[in-house]
Amino acid sequence: FKALQIGSVWRADRPQRGRYRQFTQCDIDILGEPSNLAEIELITATTTTIGRLGFKNFEIRINERRILKAMAAYSGFEEKDYDSIFITLDKMDKIGLEGVAAELGEEGYAKESIDKYLELFELLKDRKDVAEGVAFLKDKLGDFLDQEVADSLTEIATAVNATKNAEFTLVFDPTLVRGMSYY
């Protein structure tokens, strides 16, 4: 099932400064496709549209939630805490590495786990290429990161880069976190 829609959306929470309760959003949804084709098609449709609007040299950031889970497990966090940890991680672009460390510490997580977790992000900050970042993590995390998961994200990046028809860079961003609860 594929759907494309443009329409009004309303925020359930109290809008922060610079945000509106109601805004217009474009949605592309694909349901029922078990392979990576849906991901590839969504990224391609998005980049094609942005390119046709005249934008050049833009960046598309991608991540894989299962990689985040592997990073958290490797660092010693319990699975029941992942959602809370990821909500804090999602603030990285606003509060920085130190802010994330402080907030995780305030939430009562072990300093050793926090340090080990955030060290991964520090080591990844200059590895923007998807294949390079994923390969680094696979090597570092070992069995915590399933080879199939690593191959899946690399396959998506390879296909998107091979078929791109706009001027953009596909970037691996392990701080990119959005779950269904966000929406």
Feature-to-residue mapping (PLM):
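Acidic carboxylate-rich catalytic motifs and surrounding loops in phosphoryl-/glycosyl-chemistry enzymes
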Residues: 60-64, 173-174
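Acidic, His- and aromatic-enriched active-site or binding-groove loops in soluble protein domains
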Residues: 77-102
